[in-house]
């Protein structure tokens, strides 16, 4: 009797396991499709169908469905969001990415930095080389036909932490500087490429302007030093109106003003006599001479000495009729600030998700003034020469009416590199007109001036800027004939 009970128990357990196994298998093995002409509705009504929702990837989450106020003729994809560069410290950099209007598996990736330090690359995106500009109402956008995404995929990065929408959850110990920024920028790029792996094998160019004369070569150097860890196919760097060596470049501002009739011969002579002549140097007289020259700047746009000042910062109730993008609006910065502080805009571009307790501004002046002073004056020419020695092409371009970083100051820095000229100074052309002048040096460095442009070349001369950019990434000479 005991054996029979044991057998019964064993049989029950076996039956239970058998049924459980069948149920388990049914949940994993799909049922065959019903035969043609036979309805399956009656056969499966007793089953509960469980549907699992797919979880969007970080890339999919960053997809911008539509920018508020954007034109209707947009065919390219846009992305925006945050990438962690130091999770334990809670440091996140914000990016805005526009794919090219001509998608392809080989179209290059360009990373763009504005300067400052502490100035947002969204200024570059919406005032310079991106696909849109902001109307005077601060609410709507219009197309920029000379956007660089005509030729490449363009990634705009707000860096360093504290710039624009980028933030840190932990206090930053000490002053920010070049080294930490370069590390953050490198970590951003590595992590961003994991989010967008289709760009890992692409040709990559790093570009920027002003203080990006530090960011760009320093990031490029880290990439080359660590390419045995993470391969990044860096092809070249392109920097506009670059800050490369302030000890040299700072001496050219007053000379530039004098050469353009902005100060008198007497003012220039007094400055030279009391400030630069070691035998006649007099601090009090030098200070007075400098003050008189600085006073002349108050009447000028120092970023483009021939541009009008913004005299009315009030937004218009309706967007002004835009007759041509070639005429830069001196108040465009006000329009952009208004646009990026609209709640719906921030939600659309996945920015300010942590509700930063301050509004977006084009430049963080606190960060600017607290930047490591030694870093401001470091010379970047040794890094440029290292990059060139490893096959990285370098182009430096400069607007010829910029007072902040005159083209003469950039050219002076290039001359200190003692490079051999392989193609002498000559004009280059856009649409039959002189776009500026250019000179080529041994080691793959090209210097370009841009006629009629100031500190932000793509703002002042968008056609010229696009031609320079296209020439660079295609590795073709600028047009040499009208």
UniProtKB/Swiss-Prot annotation:
Per the UniProt annotation, where are the glycans attached? Answer: 228, 312, 352, 418, 444
User: What are the subcellular locations of this protein?
Assistant: Secreted
Gene3D superfamilies, per this entry?
A: 3.40.50.11320, 6.10.250.940, alpha/beta hydrolase
Its Gene Ontology biological processes?
proteolysis
Q: Name one GO cellular component term.
A: extracellular region
Signal peptide stretch: 1-25
What keywords were assigned to this record? Answer: Carboxypeptidase, Disulfide bond, Glycoprotein, Hydrolase, Protease, Secreted, Signal
According to its UniProt record, what is one Pfam family this protein matches? Peptidase_S10
What domain of life does the UniProt record list for this protein's source? Eukaryota
What's the protein called, per UniProt? Answer: Serine carboxypeptidase-like 36
Origin species, per record, is Arabidopsis thaliana (Mouse-ear cress)
